[in-house]
């Protein structure tokens, strides 16, 4: 019995343990996926009822919509700017009309024509003493003249009848000087010159090198030349070489013909020379090219008329300007050109004023070949063209005459509706140029 009871108790214990294990399995939680995290704003619940049918749907813009919006905003900004500009123009238009009316009224008071005088002395706020080519006048100063800018020695505008001061010339430089100054450098270069190797070398050493590398002359302990004179027969490349020098350097190029320095009134010629060199100093480094210098630089003699004496005064002023150069004005170079150097005054071309004299002669065969090659490089030549026939001719041709032959040959080809130049065109052009030269050539060996 004892064993039976013990056995029963053991069975009872085993049954209790089994029930506990079943309960633990039931209590163990099952795996559940995590709740997804919410990003952005909480979604609103869809409304229901009568208000939901009247509400507009929400449209979320895409990238294309944003670009279109930016484009429309930019167009709107431009339209606003245009509207503001139109309003400003309409507002300023009456002001411009009033300004123009005031200018017209001042011009009526000034009158035309006006003369130019020099202010000698300021007496008071309303009166001054001016001089015009000699005599002095006690004149009044108009109220619209800026009195703060008046100072002795300045140029003023005078009424042609009342001789009162009606204006002020801010720039004393003659307008002709501004015409002489070339704003753009010439297009010619050394490559456009056939031959003239020695002349190019000499003008480089005298004009170009002192402007580009002045330190070389300082190291050598010498002063660079002040100027050069180019002389020789017409059409040998004097003006062309001067233009090539201006092209190679970044200097201001002032070109004047000697006849332009001969003026009508007394003292205007020397004044123009002074203003020419003042403008050259102001725009330095600069090159002053005086072509046909024999117009004012001829030998001095007893003048028989006032015009001849005025020409001599102009030359004396030119000599004074050449002597007035100092070390601070080394950036100004003078180039002169003439066909008749024998007629020039020795004082003008002496060393110290014009340090180099460069001779230009008619080209030889090698130079002729280079000139023909330069001028025919862009032409359509026929197969029968033989330039050696023209080069070996014994005609005394200059560079300008060779260019005229080439141009005339091209014109003859165009006359016959041809775009290609043949040898007959060159022969006819050569005969025509030589005939013109023989008929219009100067007599007595003088150059015009």
Curated annotation (Swiss-Prot):
Annotated spans, Disordered: 1-58
Stored Gene3D superfamilies: 1.10.8.60, Nucleic acid-binding proteins (2.40.50.140), P-loop containing nucleotide triphosphate hydrolases (3.40.50.300)
Residue ranges with Basic and acidic residues bias: 19-31
GO molecular-function term, one example from the UniProt record: ATP hydrolysis activity
Listed SMART domains: AAA (SM00382)
Location(s), subcellular: Cytoplasm; Nucleus
GO biological process entries: proteasomal protein catabolic process; proteasome-mediated ubiquitin-dependent protein catabolic process
Family: Belongs to the AAA ATPase family.
Protein name: 26S proteasome regulatory subunit 4 homolog
Organism, as annotated: Schizosaccharomyces pombe (strain 972 / ATCC 24843) (Fission yeast)
Organism classification: Eukaryota, Fungi, Dikarya, Ascomycota, Taphrinomycotina
């Amino acid at each position: 019995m004892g064993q039976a009871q013990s056995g029963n108790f053991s069975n009872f214990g085993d049954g209790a343990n089994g029930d506990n294990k079943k309960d633990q399995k039931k209590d163990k939680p099952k795996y559940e996926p995590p709740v997804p995290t919410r990003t952005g704003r909480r979604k609103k619940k869809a409304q229901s009822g009568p208000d939901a049918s009247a509400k507009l749907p929400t449209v979320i813009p895409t990238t294309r919509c944003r670009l279109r919006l930016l484009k429309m905003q930019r167009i709107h900004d431009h339209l606003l700017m245009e509207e503001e500009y139109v309003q400003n123009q309409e507002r300023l238009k009456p002001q411009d009309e009033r300004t123009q009316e005031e200018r017209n009224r001042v011009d009526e008071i000034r009158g035309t024509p006006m003369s130019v005088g020099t202010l000698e002395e300021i007496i008071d706020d309303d009166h001054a003493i001016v001089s015009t080519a000699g005599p002095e006048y006690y004149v009044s100063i108009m109220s619209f003249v800026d009195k703060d800018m008046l100072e002795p020695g300045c140029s003023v505008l005078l009424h042609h009848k009342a001789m009162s001061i009606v204006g002020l010339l801010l720039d004393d430089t003659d307008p002709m000087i501004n015409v002489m100054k070339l704003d753009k450098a010439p297009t010619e270069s050394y490559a456009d010159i056939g031959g003239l190797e020695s002349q190019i070398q000499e003008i480089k050493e005298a004009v170009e090198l002192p402007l580009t590398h002045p330190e070389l002359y300082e190291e050598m302990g010498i002063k660079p030349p002040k100027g050069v004179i180019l002389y020789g027969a017409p059409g040998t490349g004097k003006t062309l070489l001067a233009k090539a020098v201006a092209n190679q350097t970044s200097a201001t190029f002032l070109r004047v013909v000697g006849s332009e320095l001969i003026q009508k009134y007394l003292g205007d010629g020397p004044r123009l020379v002074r203003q020419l060199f003042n403008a050259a100093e102001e725009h330095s480094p600069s090159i002053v090219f005086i072509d046909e210098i024999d117009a004012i630089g001829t030998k001095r003699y007893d003048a028989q008329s006032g015009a001849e004496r005025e020409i001599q005064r102009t030359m004396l002023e030119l000599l004074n300007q050449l002597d007035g150069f100092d070390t601070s004005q080394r950036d100004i170079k003078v180039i002169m050109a003439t066909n008749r150097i024998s007629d020039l005054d020795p004082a003008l071309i002496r060393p110290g004023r014009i340090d180099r004299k460069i001779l230009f002669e008619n080209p030889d065969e090698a130079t002729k070949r280079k000139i023909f090659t330069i001028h025919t490089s862009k032409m359509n030549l026929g197969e029968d063209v033989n330039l050696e026939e023209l080069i070996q001719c014994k005609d005394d041709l200059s560079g300008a005459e060779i260019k005229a032959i080439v141009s005339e040959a091209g014109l003859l080809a165009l006359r016959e509706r041809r775009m290609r130049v043949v040898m007959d065109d060159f022969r006819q052009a050569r005969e025509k140029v030589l005939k013109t030269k023989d008929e219009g050539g100067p007599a007595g060996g003088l150059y015009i």
